[in-house]
UniProtKB/Swiss-Prot annotation:
PROSITE patterns: ABC_TRANSPORTER_1, ABC_TRANSPORTER_2, CBIO. This is Energy-coupling factor transporter ATP-binding protein EcfA1. The lineage of its organism: Bacteria, Bacillati, Bacillota, Bacilli, Bacillales. SUPFAM superfamilies: P-loop containing nucleoside triphosphate hydrolases. Forms a stable energy-coupling factor (ECF) transporter complex composed of 2 membrane-embedded substrate-binding proteins (S component), 2 ATP-binding proteins (A component) and 2 transmembrane proteins (T component). The keyword Translocase applies. It comes from Staphylococcus aureus (strain bovine RF122 / ET3-1). Its main location: membrane. The gene is ecfA1.
Length: 269
């Protein structure tokens, strides 16, 4: 399979957690564009988190294929390909493994047998990129939730991934910390040309994306740019998703397009 513009491709993927259970994913096909921000959105039970598990190998497909950089993922090559993908999970407390910040970032590098001098350089650079270098010696209980997620991103960046998956990574943060983290992710994507995949139930987060995949009941419900998705926003509420505030207001005002950021809403008003 040759697709130079996609980093990950799902082709007719189906999955069930138990052989006698209903399928969580049903004949799912989509492409993740290389170097872009893709948001995979859906309510609970839509299959979005299962997609993340398949991408990082926690689960294996029952039928269909997953390709990474044009290579079909198999048991033989998975470990090699997996090293190129980093993931940040929902609960920041569950992913902090070091006693202090810099040890947490170094943990993955130690597992990859990175030499000490190189490890020190990578840890410092990664913490600097997420504005946490001054807190390198802090214990986790001295950090806010948003700061812990920054450390989690630094731990991933230190491994030089091509893809970062955010699995509901902002869902436990307050609105300010959430927006700060999304701004950081946008900066990291731009500076390193990293592919971002955000798994979320929050359509506000999808507004940040270049490419949006909406999941419903284990199938792809809609796919396109954020503008394309929100220009037909009425269908999103029927599958249990809550529209972002500026789009709700824009619809109430009767404007032609549904897609609107907070800044755009202010301009309209």
């Amino acid at each position: 399979m040759e697709d130079k513009n996609s980093v990950i491709v799902f082709k007719n993927v189906s999955f069930q957690y138990q052989s006698d259970a209903s399928f969580t994913l049903k004949d799912v096909s989509f492409n993740i564009p290389k170097g872009q921000w893709t948001s995979i959105v859906g309510h609970n039970g839509s299959g979005k988190s299962t997609i993340a598990k398949l991408m990082i190998g926690i689960e294996k497909v029952k039928s269909g294929e997953i390709f990474y950089n044009n290579q079909a993922i198999t048991d033989d090559n998975f470990e090699k390909l997996r090293k190129d993908i980093g993931i940040v999970f929902q609960n920041p407390d569950n992913q902090f493994v070091g006693s202090i910040v810099k040890y947490d970032v170094a943990f993955g590098l130690e597992n990859h047998a990175v030499p000490h001098d190189e490890m020190h350089r990578r840890v410092s650079e990664a913490l600097k990129q997420v504005d946490m270098l001054e807190r390198a010696d802090y214990e986790p209980n001295a950090l806010s939730g948003g700061q812990k997620q920054r450390v989690a991103i630094a731990s991933v960046l230190a491994l030089n991934p091509s893809v970062i998956i955010l699995d509901e990574a902002t869902s436990m943060l307050d609105p300010d910390a959430r927006q700060n983290l999304l701004d950081l992710v946008r900066k990291v994507k731009s500076e390193h040309n990293i592919t971002i995949i955000s798994i979320t139930h929050d359509l506000s987060e999808a507004m940040e994306a270049d490419h949006v995949i909406v999941m419903n009941k284990g199938t792809v419900y809609k796919e396109g740019t954020a503008i394309e998705i929100f220009d037909h926003a009425e269908g999103l509420t029927t599958i249990g998703l809550d529209l972002p505030f500026p789009i709700k207001i824009n619809q109430m005002l009767g404007h032609q397009t549904s897609f609107l950021t907070y800044e755009g809403l202010v301009d309209q008003l």
